[in-house]
Amino acid sequence: MDVIPAIDLLEGRCVRLYQGDYDRSQVFSENPVDVAKQWVDQGANRLHIVDLDGAKAGKVVNLGAIEAIAHAVSVPIEIGGGLRDRTSVQQLFNLGIQWAILGTIAVEQPQLVQELCAEFPGQIIIGIDARNGRVATRGWLETSEVLATQLAVQMQELGAAAIIYTDIHRDGTLIGPNLEALRELAAVISIPIIASGGVSSLTDLLSLLALEPQGVTGVIVGRALYTGDILLKEALRAIGPGRIQDIPPNLGFSSFA
């Protein structure tokens, strides 16, 4: 399973939000490039970057920081936040970014998503950010009436390469991932699912690993890496592609299997 460190950009700095609240941001580094290099040095084989300013503005804002990170590391990068038109997506791919994460336009402009999936096969990921099972948009500032499961099915039909599922109530809280929501999602789609939000410990990671046969192929880890609750090297050893054993130890997770 992929363990993907998250780098959230706000005003050019690396921050973490609490439940997506811009007023509750915590700065972890003034230099996102150093952070990216640190995660790659510790074994990350993929990075997750969110342009928080972009998500709010509806266009890419932290392009300078994104470009600097892309030049500084050799691992593939996925980026989301403010990608609401073809030009923005093309702009990122021109920098060598591997995947574009689309959120708001998946709800508001599905036709555009279909066109982008056709033009950039395998490179369009849909970010489904949910509050109580319903999809939030525009930097999580608005909540729609669309169910996460409905949107996932529609996006799979339109050609999305994968779904990143974020439970907003858990994001930045360290209270554990929403396993039930991930199971529900995995039951209705066959494309890969990447879990995000609330991961706080190796125990959480092992419970997600139990969902790998159902299609949960990766996990994005943010705050827990920055606070030291999870050490990236340990996480990779526990659930990563080269993990010590394919069957996690029996730590009482049988109910998650």
Swiss-Prot record:
Record's subcellular location: Cytoplasm
Entry keyword Amino-acid biosynthesis: yes
GO biological process: L-histidine biosynthetic process; L-tryptophan biosynthetic process
Highest taxon of the lineage: Bacteria
CDD domains: HisA
Coiled coil (residue ranges): none
GO cellular component terms attached to this protein's record: cytoplasm
Active site (catalytic residues): 8, 129
Assigned EC number: 5.3.1.16
Pathway assignment: Amino-acid biosynthesis; L-histidine biosynthesis; L-histidine from 5-phospho-alpha-D-ribose 1-diphosphate: step 4/9
Pfam family, one: His_biosynth
Catalytic activity: 1-(5-phospho-beta-D-ribosyl)-5-[(5-phospho-beta-D-ribosylamino)methylideneamino]imidazole-4-carboxamide = 5-[(5-phospho-1-deoxy-D-ribulos-1-ylimino)methylamino]-1-(5-phospho-beta-D-ribosyl)imidazole-4-carboxamide
Keywords from the named record: Amino-acid biosynthesis, Cytoplasm, Histidine biosynthesis, Isomerase
GO-annotated molecular function: 1-(5-phosphoribosyl)-5-[(5-phosphoribosylamino)methylideneamino]imidazole-4-carboxamide isomerase activity
HAMAP family xref list: HisA
Recorded family membership: Belongs to the HisA/HisF family.
The protein's name in its UniProt record: 1-(5-phosphoribosyl)-5-[(5-phosphoribosylamino)methylideneamino] imidazole-4-carboxamide isomerase
Species assigned in the record: Nostoc punctiforme (strain ATCC 29133 / PCC 73102)
Lineage: Bacteria, Bacillati, Cyanobacteriota, Cyanophyceae, Nostocales
